[in-house]
C-alpha cells in the first residue's frame, strides 16, 4: 500500500500543473505495476524513490503496511535529500 502525508501534499501543490498530472499518472502506475521501468522504483539508502517524469522524484519511507510518501520535487532537490 502507498500512503501520503500532509507534507507531501504541500510539496505537490507547489509543482507546476503539468508535473502534477505526471505525478498522478505515475502514482496510478505505481499502484498497478510498481516494477514498470519508467518508474525507477527503488530503495535509495533509507528512502524509497520513484521517478515522476524525467526531472522530478518522490521519496517515501517504509512503514508497517507499505510506503509513506512524504516528499516530491526536482531531481536536484532529490539529490540533496538522499545525500544527507
How does the language model describe each region?
Residues 1-26:
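Arg/Lys-rich, positively charged N-terminal/basic patches that mediate binding to nucleic acids
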Residues 2, 24, 35-38, 72:
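Non-catalytic, surface-exposed connector residues within folded enzymatic/regulatory domains
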Residues 9, 27, 48, 69-71:
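Tryptophan-centered motif/residue detector
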Residues 14, 29, 64-66:
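A very general structural signal that marks isolated residues within well-ordered alpha-helical segments
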Residues 16-19, 41, 69:
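Low-complexity, intrinsically disordered short peptide segments enriched in small/polar/basic residues
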Residues 26-52:
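A short, surface-exposed loop/turn module that caps and links secondary-structure elements
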